[in-house]
Amino acid sequence: MELRARGWWLLCAAAALVACTRGDPASKSRSCSEVRQIYGAKGFSLSDVPQAEISGEHLRICPQGYTCCTSEMEENLANHSRMELETALHDSSRALQATLATQLHGIDDHFQRLLNDSERTLQDAFPGAFGDLYTQNTRAFRDLYAELRLYYRGANLHLEETLAEFWARLLERLFKQLHPQLLLPDDYLDCLGKQAEALRPFGDAPRELRLRATRAFVAARSFVQGLGVASDVVRKVAQVPLAPECSRAVMKLVYCAHCRGVPGARPCPDYCRNVLKGCLANQADLDAEWRNLLDSMVLITDKFWGPSGAEYVIGSVHMWLAEAINALQDNKDTLTAKVIQGCGNPKVNPHGSGPEEKRRRAKLALQEKSSTGTLEKLVSEAKAQLRDIQDYWISLPGTLCSEKMAMSPASDDRCWNGISKGRYLPEVMGDGLANQINNPEVEVDITKPDMTIRQQIMQLKIMTNRLRGAYGGNDVDFQDASDDGSGSGSGGGCPDDACGRRVSKKSSSSRTPLIHALPGLSEQEGQKTSAATRPEPHYFFLLFLFTLVLAAARPRWR
């Protein structure tokens, strides 16, 4: 009888063990068919993809509950999620660069066309208006326009000195042409040059051109240069690689729901923002100087209008040149007398002809040209675009979450919070590197800013200072603002209020969300939801039953 009782004990214990091992119908592993379909659609082999959920102790990024992912699948999806984010960043960068390039080319082409039209008018009208005074000096005029183009394009020229040298050379050549009967050696011409400022042989034209051209050209080229620097900054920042911590966080954001067997769960909005704010923390630090640059560019467009504005002045250079030659011819006799008085009587040239009595006058209409409205339209479009992209760097995480990360439309019990389907409770971090010290999703070392981005912040500062100088009409030294080495090492320290803080740590208390049961959620699904954070209870029950079996069998072993 005692043996029969022991047998029943053993039989019951064995049945209990089998039942616990197989589980009740509600706790059977879910199918991975949907995950297999999505995984295969991304070009991966399905040979090692499980048909149903398996234990997830092997996972290194995703929660280690029941899973549809093997280690290889997790690694493949992690690499794929990183490439998807990199592609999204590059696409956004290219779109912004294209916007800036469109504005740059439109306005740059317009200013260059104005200068080309001015030179073409000069070439067409001056031969008939001034004869040999122009045709024998075409190279001097051609060189002037060439240097104006170089200056506009950002060459390191001093415009006032360039214009002064042009007028000095032109005065020497024209004075000799107007007095072919005189011998004018170099020392005599040097004396002429020294008296030129007091004699004002070209009237007010040189001074007017200098004052207006300096302000007009520096305003035009600083605006175009600003567009170029902005585009170059965007291009270089797009080349900054994602940190390994970011790659892990993005995998968890995008594909751990698939591994968890809930591929339909889309990332919670605040969860997505925290991940990308951590990933793009350095990029957000561009915001302040980026805004300063765009504000300065909008402001400098005020210098494009009116009689001293860039549009009128650049397109009217030939008119001041014509006015200058007219003044020289008008004042020829008075000028000659004053030069002889100051420099002495020059010798007569025995081979020279007599003074040309027939004075040729320009027939150019010197009235102000009416605006075609082209520049107004281009500038209006550019200013609107610049205002639209002012918050580009700090809005980038939200934009990517909305457009590229298939973010859930609302933060509710049905979105993916990084562990399961449920609400995401941590607060959203601020913008920039210093604000990521407590980011619950991405481990960010706020004491180590990205040096490439710090260099680009310095480039924005340099360009902004040039624009502000240009607004005041100053002839700014336009060395290449896109030089990779410029500003190297500058701005590399952490912000004053953040120095001394250490790398951010993920707080389990702030990270673990509360899990709310969904309507119709089975007991099996509820258990699997929390599998990553607590042990399965039936393991304790198995241990208890196994102890009973040993106790029942002990007398038999004696």
Curated annotation (Swiss-Prot):
Q: In which tissues is it expressed?
A: Nervous system.
Query: Does the keyword tRNA-binding belong to this entry?
Result: no
Q: What Pfam families does the record tag this protein with? A: Glypican
Q: Which GO terms describe its cellular component?
A: cell surface; endosome; extracellular matrix; extracellular region; membrane raft; neuronal cell body; plasma membrane; side of membrane
Example GO biological process = Schwann cell differentiation
| Coiled coil feature spans | none
Look up the signal peptide feature and give its range. Answer: 1-23
Predominant localisation class: membrane
What positions does the record give for glycosylation? N79, N116, S486, S488, S490
Its subcellular locations are:
Cell membrane; Endosome
Disulfide bond positions: C32-C68, C62-C256, C69-C259, C191-C343, C246-C279, C268-C415, C272-C401
In its keyword annotation, does this UniProt entry include Signal?
Answer: yes
Query: Which segments carry the region annotation Disordered?
Result: 478-531
Annotated lipid attachment (GPI-anchor amidated serine): S530
Which keywords annotate this record? Cell membrane, Copper, Disulfide bond, Endosome, Glycoprotein, GPI-anchor, Heparan sulfate, Lipoprotein, Membrane, Proteoglycan, Secreted, Signal, Zinc
This protein's membrane topology, according to the annotation, is:
Lipid-anchor; GPI-anchor
The name this protein goes by in its record: Glypican-1
- Provenance organism: Rattus norvegicus
Q: What is the lineage of its organism?
A: Eukaryota, Metazoa, Chordata, Craniata, Vertebrata
